[in-house]
Amino acid sequence: MAGSRRRIRLALLFGGRSTEHAISCISASGVLRALDRDVYDVVPVGIDTHGRWVVLPDDPTALAVTGDRLPAVVAAHGESVVLAADPTTPGLLPCRPRGGLDSVRNTLGSSDALGSSDIPGDIDVVFPLLHGPFGEDGTVQGLLEMAGLPYVGSGVFASAAAMDKQHMKALLRAAGLPVGSYAVLRAGDTLTGADQERLGLPVFVKPARGGSSIGISRVEAWADLDTAIKAARASDPKVLVESAIVGREIECGVLGILDGPGAEASVPAEITVTSSAGFYDFEAKYMSDATHFDVPANLSHAVREEVRGAAIAAFEALDCAGLARVDMFVTADDHVIINEVNTMPGFTPTSMFPRMWEASGVTYPQLVDRLVRLALRDGAGLR
């Protein structure tokens, strides 16, 4: 229509090579439903577990959980593409099965078809809805900066620092923020007797660069430590052993302010786990009803504001951008201890980040739109 505004072409990246592949797909299903097609020309780009990029149909139902089946990106269901790291060329290029590049068209076709002649090359903004290594850890963020594409979320440094729990905790502690006691085990390392005495029991053993509680074990006896370390190393050769903190599990969302600098915090939420695992593991998060959520959390005004302030302080200490979810503990004497910072929190229907913002007056579609607008405002280049 003459005079109509061109839609914003948004590439939604999901899937990926990490163990959180399925969670990313479920998150993408929710975001696809939330995006206004009158505003956005959406290009769903799935990354399979081998790292192949494919343009897929714009179908949220294909990425939803069906019974006990988790979704996955299947390369055969779409058209293979690569992202050009040269900012002078279109963002997405058709790719032959053996890796050769087709010629790039001068005139781009519709994104509704999946033929190689219709792959939309030019991209205005990217939403890298990827969780875990090879997606949330600064790798894809660096690629997007090389390609000259604006993208949702934190930059290379913040993404990498938040993904690696060792460095995240070190940076938070250096900023004067409270974190729990921990030890780092690299390949071949074992926990020393001095560390055992310092940490005490129980402890949590987890991959240093994992998420969605995959590979995490609660250890009640030192005799079980080696088994837990082996389980964590299935995801990451570097492992963290953390002192268990007795307290309420509290989460708080942080979101960039669109019409000015800085960020704001959502109302906090509380997680109570009733499963036999006794902690917020993968099954409790995504596959069962063994978790109770209070949104907002029942906290005193003073503690609530301390939690919100700590969330923003952690966000700023890591130099985050766009969004983050900060996980904390509140002890019986109302001390706030920061556990983790997630720079690309889940967007599944049960995820806490959108639920906390919904309780704060920001609807799911408004949340997604604001994140994209923040990315467009900040533009391409270094964060």
UniProtKB/Swiss-Prot annotation:
Cellular component terms per the entry's GO annotation: cytosol
GO BP: cell wall organization; peptidoglycan biosynthetic process; regulation of cell shape
Matches recorded under SUPFAM superfamilies: Glutathione synthetase ATP-binding domain-like (SSF56059), PreATP-grasp domain (SSF52440)
Record-listed ATP binding positions: 196-251
Annotated catalysed reactions: 2 D-alanine + ATP = D-alanyl-D-alanine + ADP + phosphate + H(+)
Molecular function per GO: ATP binding; D-alanine-D-alanine ligase activity; metal ion binding
Residue sites binding Mg(2+) 2 per the record: 340, 342
Tree of life domain: Bacteria
Domain ATP-grasp: 169-373
Pfam family, one: Dala_Dala_lig_C
Keywords linked to the UniProt accession: ATP-binding, Cell shape, Cell wall biogenesis/degradation, Cytoplasm, Ligase, Magnesium, Manganese, Metal-binding, Nucleotide-binding, Peptidoglycan synthesis
Family: Belongs to the D-alanine--D-alanine ligase family.
Protein name: D-alanine--D-alanine ligase
Lineage: Bacteria, Bacillati, Actinomycetota, Actinomycetes, Frankiales
Originating gene: ddl
